[in-house]
Regions:
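Short low-complexity stretches enriched in small and charged residues
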Residues: 1-3, 47, 108
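Short coil/turn linker and secondary-structure boundary residues
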Residues: 2, 39, 72-75, 98, ...
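Soluble or luminal CAZymes and related metallo-dependent hydrolases
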Residues: 3, 10-14, 83-87
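Active-site rim elements
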Residues: 3-8, 76-81, 125-129
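Short, contiguous alpha-helical
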Residues: 8-22, 27-70, 110-161
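Helix-adjacent hinge/juxtasegments
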Residues: 57-99
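Acidic catalytic patch
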Residues: 97-114
Length: 161
C-alpha cells in the first residue's frame, strides 16, 4: 500500500465523520462562544471545514501563509457543508495522484513570508489530520454545550443510544 493510500484510508473514515458533525452546526449559533477567550462556534466550524483544503495543499507542496489566508466569516451551515465537500474532494483527488516521493519533500507554514515551521509532507499531513480531529472534538463540546445532539464519531453517543 502506498503512502497516499494509507492517508486516503484514514480520510475515508475521518472526513465523513467530520461532515456529520458539521451538519449539526446551527447557522444561528455562529457567534456563540463558551468563554470570552474562546473562538466563536462559527470560526471553529469554519476552521474544521478548511483543513481538508490545507491537506490537499500540503501534498501539492503549496505552503500556507497565515497572513494571506482569508478571514473567518461564518455564513451558514449550508455554506459550511458545500465548502467542506469541495475541499474534501480536492484532498482525495490530490492524494489519488500523489507518489510516495512527494511525501518526502518539505512543506512550510509561514506568516507574512516568515517560515514558522517546516517538515516532511508526510509528517505535516499526519499532523494536520490530527489537528482536524482535535478541532472536531472541540466543536463537539461546543455543540453539547448548546444542547445539540451529537452524532456517532468513534462510537455511539448518549444521544444515539
Amino acid at each position: 500500500m502506498s503512502v497516499a493510500q494509507d492517508f486516503i484510508a484514514e480520510l475515508d473514515y475521518e472526513l465523513p465523520a467530520t461532515r456529520t458533525l458539521l451538519e449539526r452546526v446551527p447557522s444561528e449559533k455562529g457567534p456563540w462562544k463558551p468563554h470570552p477567550k474562546s473562538s466563536a462556534l462559527g470560526h471553529l466550524a469554519q476552521l474544521v471545514t478548511r483543513l481538508p483544503g490545507v491537506m490537499g495543499d500540503i501534498v501539492r507542496g503549496i505552503d500556507l501563509d497565515l497572513a494571506a489566508a482569508p478571514p473567518y466569516t461564518f455564513e451558514s451551515t449550508e455554506t459550511l457543508l458545500r465548502d467542506f465537500d469541495a475541499r474534501a474532494k480536492v484532498a482525495r483527488d490530490v492524494l489519488r495522484t500523489a507518489k510516495d516521493d512527494d511525501f518526502a519533500l518539505t512543506w512550510s507554514l509561514r506568516h507574512a513570508g516568515q517560515v514558522l515551521d517546516t517538515g516532511r509532507r508526510k509528517d505535516v499531513l499526519g499532523n494536520t489530520i490530527n489537528h482536524l480531529v482535535h478541532h472536531r472534538g472541540q466543536l463537539s463540546v461546543y455543540l453539547r454545550l448548546n444542547d445539540i445532539p451529537l452524532p456517532k464519531l468513534y462510537g455511539p453517543t448518549a444521544d444515539e443510544q
